[in-house]
């Protein structure tokens, strides 16, 4: 993701801060603030926001997803997989959590587990196949990268 320019960043943060001033436990605003911080290279601050949402509402599967995605980028693959497990436990039909867990498993060397998760993701969201085509382009022909899916 491209870094936000300084003006955009300041405007977004002002808007988010205004919402949080009215309701300090507004989960969506905290998640958005985390995403803005993450896209601006502030991973530790983003992590704090995502974790805070899981403390306020341990049933917010989106917070576990975002934190897991951040951990993939930080190469904390085992931790990421655990967070995706949590998101899936909260919402067994959460296709994006299966996809991201599959990506983390693949990066962690668990090709079979990755294939299983990707199949489940496609079962839940068949429109995602085009997105998966690009996801694994660096792994060689998709039939070799993830046999059994394509």
Please provide the spans of the model-predicted regions:
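Terminal, low-structured helical/coil segments at or just beyond the last alpha-helical repeat
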Residues: 107, 112-150
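Canonical tetratricopeptide repeat
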Residues: 5, 32, 66, 100, ...
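Helix-start (N-cap) detector for alpha-helical repeat units in TPR-like alpha-solenoids
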Residues: 27-28, 61-62, 95-96, 129-130
């Amino acid at each position: 993701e491209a870094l936000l320019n300084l003006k955009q960043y300041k405007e977004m943060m002002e808007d988010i801060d205004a919402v949080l001033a009215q309701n300090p436990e507004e989960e969506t605003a905290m998640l958005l603030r985390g995403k803005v911080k993450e896209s601006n290279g502030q991973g530790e601050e983003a992590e704090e926001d995502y974790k805070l949402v899981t403390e306020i509402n341990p049933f917010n599967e989106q917070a576990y997803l975002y934190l897991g995605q951040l951990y993939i980028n930080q190469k904390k693959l085992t931790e990421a997989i655990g967070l995706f497990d949590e998101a899936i436990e909260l919402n067994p039909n959460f296709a994006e959590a299966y996809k991201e867990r599959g990506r983390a498993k693949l990066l962690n060397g668990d090709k079979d587990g990755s294939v299983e998760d990707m199949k489940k993701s496609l079962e839940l969201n068949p429109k995602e196949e085009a997105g998966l085509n690009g996801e694994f382009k660096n792994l060689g022909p998709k039939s070799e990268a993830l046999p059994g899916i394509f």
